[in-house]
């Protein structure tokens, strides 16, 4: 079942933790690619110096952050790596959750091809398929075309995992500082990165 619009409403930190263990799905050329979310980061601009929307900064790139929760915010870093975020909080409150890592589930062969241009890969390469925000976007085929897309769409959405299949029974949620935000002054220390401790696909232990 797809996560309903109400799933994305409420406090961004709570939504971030709720996203752990759910499945991110992208349909590419009719083929389902997906992964279980195992690592996220919350961004609570305009008061969060690590957020693109800090200070209420409103640009063409960040405009989607000011819209309704439950939409995709995709951007490029270093001019080459895409990052996928889920918009949270009410309209006009630019907050979101960066999906940092997934455990691949569906479309494994397509994911391998997207990452390595081959399907015969090593165990180390397999663990590297979706263990980072840029990696998972490449694996699932998420690009700037998906920016602003509703997560109620048929092609891009979050699938709720039934409780009896949820990996939360195997891993504990850990919290810590977010990654690669050295510019963010005191926000560097906010423990707004949430992940499954010990999960092999987490980007940074």
Swiss-Prot record:
As recorded in UniProt, its EC number(s) are: 3.2.2.-
Any Pfam family hit: Pur_DNA_glyco
Specify the species: Bacillus cereus (strain G9842)
Q: Is Chaperone among the key words of this record?
A: no
Q: What name has this protein been given in UniProt?
A: Putative 3-methyladenine DNA glycosylase
Keyword DNA damage assigned to the entry: answer is yes
Among the GO molecular function terms of this UniProt record, one is: alkylbase DNA N-glycosylase activity
Q: Which cysteines are joined by disulfide bonds?
A: none
Domain of life assignment: Bacteria
Keyword annotations? DNA damage, DNA repair, Hydrolase
Q: Which PANTHER family match?
A: DNA-3-METHYLADENINE GLYCOSYLASE
Matches recorded under Gene3D superfamilies: Methylpurine-DNA glycosylase (MPG)
Tell me its family.
Belongs to the DNA glycosylase MPG family.
GO terms (BP aspect):
base-excision repair
